[in-house]
Amino acid sequence: MRGKLLPLAGLYLVQGLPYGLQSGLLPVLLRAGGLSLTRVGLAKVLYAPWLLKLAWAPLVDAQGSARAWVTRSTAGLGLVCGLLAGLPPPGAGQAGLPAAVAGLLLLLNLGAAMQDVALDALAVQLLEPAELGPGNTVQVVAYKLGAALAGGALLALLPTFSWPQLFLLLAATYWLAAALAWAAPALRRLPQQPPSEQRPHTAHLLRDVLAVPGTVWTAGFVLTYKLGEQGASSLFPLLLLDHGVSAPELGLWNGVGAVVCSIAGSSLGGTLLAKHWKLLPLLRSVLRFRLGGLACQTALVFHLDTLGASMDAGTILRGSALLSLCLQHFLGGLVTTVTFTGMMRCSQLAPRALQATHYSLLATLELLGKLLLGTLAGGLADGLGPHPCFLLLLILSAFPVLYLDLAPSTFL
């Protein structure tokens, strides 16, 4: 199994680089180059290709092997980074992002989204059912480490590395990963698709995908299982900021602490699944723990506004609030790994010619569910007030626990 997990770890690590690059490193580079905050924010439009993953997933299924797609897309990402290294960085006084840089960053997102589709399809084909738990732990942890390296470690190198040097370093990393994808023995042993399965019936593609056992239920679950959690994780740190917690302290707990706890939770999820814990009972237990954690966090939100409540340094309330952030990220990482294992198990039931499309559908719905409440939570808090908003988030977190009672046998 190690021969499979090590190359997957390397590939998922580089898959996380574009997210870290554009969420952590790029905004600082653009701002340091003199762009306004508005212009820096508008650069997020370049994420658009990620919303279209499902459009080219059938192409990955129909043309060539997933290994070939991973190799080509990863090498292409290295080429784009090499071209970016040859362009001057945004300079002071520029009205916006230079067109050439913006175009290459758009290509970077396109290649990264295509690599995401192909790599998930590769993992679905490569891993045996007993390997899904450790495999999904590798997926989640390596991706988060890659994002942290691009958004944090490279950011720390800014004083000594120039724009060209940073992107040349990224290009070399991608080319090494492409060589790994092509040469890894475990990936070379993947069976080729039979010619009859090379091209799915595109006219009925969605119907064929939804006909895979357990797909409709799994789609509903992945769309809703993070609603309450994402809303709370977006709002709670801001409420703590409003009540006197400093931005640096909040950054430490909700940044470094959150990543460490999330990785620990993901690792525990993979360990429990590797020890042959049943997926559905484990998921039910974790969701109940998460619901209890959110209930405690909701109680803290109510207590913050009571007369005499103090968030001064050293108080029990302050410590409880900061620890609740870490607890929710730990449980969030745990539930993510278990859920991704269920998604991959469901996609393995699809014909090989549909697996990339099938998993991309589930992954897109999972992302949509996370973005939905993360985006709307602020508006709900402003419109309803923090107390009713957190009660609503608590109800939304209870829904997946009840929804598990309808789980099909394929999710057991």
From Swiss-Prot:
The chain crosses the membrane at residues 10-30, 40-60, 73-93, 94-114, 138-158, 166-186, 209-229, 250-270, 291-311, 321-341, 361-381, 384-404. Pfam families: MFS_1. It comes from the Eukaryota. Keywords: Membrane, Transmembrane, Transmembrane helix, Transport. The keyword Transport applies. CDD domains: MFS_MFSD3 (cd17485). It is a multi-pass membrane protein. Its main location: membrane. It is found in: Membrane. One of its GO terms (cellular component) is membrane. GO terms for molecular function: transmembrane transporter activity. Belongs to the major facilitator superfamily. This is Major facilitator superfamily domain-containing protein 3.
